Amino acid sequence: MIMPKDTSNNTRSQDTNYNAIPLFPSIVLQTTVPNFEELIDLAYAQRTEQESVIASNMGGWHSQLQPIPELLHKYMPFPEWEGTCWYMINGNMQGNYSHTHPQNDWAGVLWLKVPEEHGAKLEFEHPDCFAQYNAINSMNHYHPDVQDKFNYWQAYAFPPIAGHMLMFPASLRHRVYFSEATEDRISLSFNITLPTLEFNQR
């Protein structure tokens, strides 16, 4: 049964003192990697030798899978891991459609070359945005402080910065906006698998 709307207590939700608890957050790790410029030359060299793989890319060039460069090994936050990587070179009006990285634990990207005025952000989608569509919208309408404090959005986009690296759960759906620049946007993406550990719960 649909209850009638009670307009007599409109201020109650605003005045009630609640603690917002970010339960089951999606963790995105961010760091910077110096001396990455040599990887740009490697990406261009491979493009002259390899045809593009077709995966999530809409246009652009996607290299073959290969070992993760030793340069990045010390930035992996795990003592044991296995992984592969690939280069992406996107030009004007090229990007990546929404996807995940199945059969992996973590995924990541290191931005190598980022043209100005590109617009090619990396967007992450809320893992349960469709089921929680109204919950997210209503909380953000009445309590925008929760949205800002806990990134309680339907989607969140990171602007790429050369030398910056993100790592995120491989199941977290994401996409890359079309590049609006005429210069190349180059990145190194990777997948990480980890050994099975004892389950930890509260």
Language-model features: where?
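Histidine-centered metal-chelating micro-motifs
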Residues: 94-95, 171-175
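Catalytic core of non-heme Fe(II) oxygenases with the double-stranded beta-helix
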Residues: 90-165, 184, 197-202
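Non-heme Fe(II)/2-oxoglutarate
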Residues: 2-79, 86-88, 93-96, 121
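Ligand-binding loop in jelly-roll beta-barrel domains
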Residues: 173, 177-187
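Short beta-strand segments enriched in hydrophobic/aromatic residues
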Residues: 112, 172, 192-194
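A structural signal for short, well-ordered beta-strand segments
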Residues: 85-87, 108-110, 188-192
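Histidine-centered active-site/metal-ligand motif
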Residues: 86, 99-101, 174
